[in-house]
Each structure stands twice: as structure tokens, then as C-alpha cells.
């Protein structure tokens, strides 16, 4: 796949491999991609959307690797099995979505914040020992449910996360006692969120609550609503895809990484 416009320094070739990561709760299958040449690169931990580790995410991770980064995409649903944990069509249209989520919902609920952050520690330790990853802090980015995981990871491991981003995230600032936004006071990273417009999983009151939490905590951040873009706008294998919003996401993510590393 050719590099996208505005990706910054372009690497001519990347190498993607499937890797296994040991955790306290078993083995995680993951995708690692990095530039073929140039030695160790700054590392990015990439949190999947609910549809999981699949060709679209590998394609996106490869694009980020071509911009000069080592990217790790773990299957966060590993407790249910190796990816894909449910059968997916090549293209997920609006009609297929409800049934896929019906099958995924128990697995999503089973990934508690405690389990997810225990896993995050394993991912970060693995990257610290990975020869393709430069030493020092990493960046984290997440999509859909992964946006909340990115935010939580920045709060749980402030000494390891220098930048955190989330795109078309949902339920980021709820009334729950373990809502993701409540970690804001522990974050030292720079944070960016690109919210979907008219997203039922992230209504305006949650956007305002998240903004207030980050501001009150003194977190360097920017939160933007992508007008007209629906939930899932970065995923070209779904009916939610919005090319203009996706390219805006790339510009924002690459800008954040350029400021960080």
C-alpha cells in the first residue's frame, strides 16, 4: 500500500510480523510492523476497535510504520481466542453491524479496566525489550473502544506514555465510578481526541466532561469534533468510513507523534 499524503518522512519498506506476548492471563497474539531500515524507532501501542485485529488494522499500522515508527497492535480480546474472535465479512455494512456486536458484547464486557491495564503493562514491557523499538516512553493510539484504553493506559503508566490519542471513542466520560476520564489527574502525556460527530456513544455532555477533566488536571490536550463524521470514520472496511475525516485523523496523529519524538 502506498504511503498516504501528509505522512511526513516516508520509509520505502516496512516489515510486518505476527508476534506472541506473554501476560499473566495467557498469550496475546499481536501484529508488529516497523521500517526495514534505520534501526530502532519510536514505539506506538495501537489499540484496536471492537471489530478487532484484521487486515484493515494491519494496513493502518503499516502506514504508520512507513512514517518512521515501530507499531504494536495487540488482540485485546485474547482471552476469548486468537484474532478474529468472531467471523467478519470483508466489508461490514450497516445491516451486519448489530449481529456482530451482539456476538462481541460478552467479550467486550469481560475486558474490565483491571484486566485491560494488566495487559497494557505486558505490552509496554514487551516494547521495552523489543530491539525494533527505541528506548524511552511510547505513544498510544486507540479507535472506538480502543480510545478509552489509550486514555486509561496514559493514566496507569504515566512514566511510560508520552503521547496518547483516541479517535471516534465512546463512553469516555460516563457517570460510572471507573469512567476513563477519571484517570486525567495521573496523565503526564500530551493527549489528542478526534471525536465523531453525533455519536450516540459519546454525547455532547460526555465530550464536555472529558474536556473539563483534562483541563482541570492540567493535561496538555486538544479535543476536536469531526463535523459530519460518524462513529468508526477511520475504518475503510465498514460503512462508517469517511475518507476526509480519516485523513484528518492521520494529520492529527502524525502531528502529535512529531511533537513527541
Give the residues covered by each predicted segment.
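N-terminal cap/leader regions of alpha/beta-hydrolase-fold enzymes
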Residues: 1-261
Amino acid at each position: 500500500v502506498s504511503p498516504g499524503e501528509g505522512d511526513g518522512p516516508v520509509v520505502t519498506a516496512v516489515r510486518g510480523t505476527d508476534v506472541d506476548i506473554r501476560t499473566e492471563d495467557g498469550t496475546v497474539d499481536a501484529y508488529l510492523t516497523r521500517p526495514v531500515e534505520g534501526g530502532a524507532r519510536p514505539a506506538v501501542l495501537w489499540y484496536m476497535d471492537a471489530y478487532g485485529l484484521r487486515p484493515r488494522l494491519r494496513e493502518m499500522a503499516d502506514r504508520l510504520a512507513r512514517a518512521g515508527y515501530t507499531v504494536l497492535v495487540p488482540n485485546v480480546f485474547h482471552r476469548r481466542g486468537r484474532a478474529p474472535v468472531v467471523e467478519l465479512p470483508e466489508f461490514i455494512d450497516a445491516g451486519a453491524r448489530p449481529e456482530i456486536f451482539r456476538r462481541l458484547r460478552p467479550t467486550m464486557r469481560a475486558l474490565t479496566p483491571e484486566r485491560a491495564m494488566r495487559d497494557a503493562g505486558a505490552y509496554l514491557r514487551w516494547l521495552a525489550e523489543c530491539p525494533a523499538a527505541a528506548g524511552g516512553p511510547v505513544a498510544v493510539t486507540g479507535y472506538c473502544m480502543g480510545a478509552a484504553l489509550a486514555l486509561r493506559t496514559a493514566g496507569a503508566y504515566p512514566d511510560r506514555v508520552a503521547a496518547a490519542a483516541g479517535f471516534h471513542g465512546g463512553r469516555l466520560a460516563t457517570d460510572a465510578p471507573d469512567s476513563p476520564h477519571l484517570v486525567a489527574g495521573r496523565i503526564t502525556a500530551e493527549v489528542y481526541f478526534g471525536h465523531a460527530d453525533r455519536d450516540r456513544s459519546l454525547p455532547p455532555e460526555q465530550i464536555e466532561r472529558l474536556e473539563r477533566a483534562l483541563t482541570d488536571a492540567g493535561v496538555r490536550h486538544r479535543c476536536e469534533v469531526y463535523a459530519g463524521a460518524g462513529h468508526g470514520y477511520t475504518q475503510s472496511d465498514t460503512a462508517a468510513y469517511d475518507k476526509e475525516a480519516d485523513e484528518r485523523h492521520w494529520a492529527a496523529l502524525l502531528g502529535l507523534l512529531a511533537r513527541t519524538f
